[in-house]
């Protein structure tokens, strides 16, 4: 799992209010979340942006094709060129990939407030669309 989400994943896995299901790949997580949606749940997929590349086929041939509304939380590794070399290209192109797939994006910053996040989540639910909440390193603890 992404180190940016480490504490969040630990919280979710220990909290009985949530059903945290770890996946071996991001495309597997997309498939599990799609099935959960079809079973009447409101899934959230947590992934590192390198996993976005792995999941593009699952997003385009399943989620977007069949209009399955998923809430993606994607960490922005490689943002601003400050990261390990393997994260730099995806960090540079991630927003472009999401734009090409017509997936609305909200970039969470330390200045974002709770109402902005709630409104973004409501838009996702009300419009029945897949959206992506982008997290930069250091925004969440």
Which residues fall in each region the model found?
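Thiamine diphosphate
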Residues: 1-141
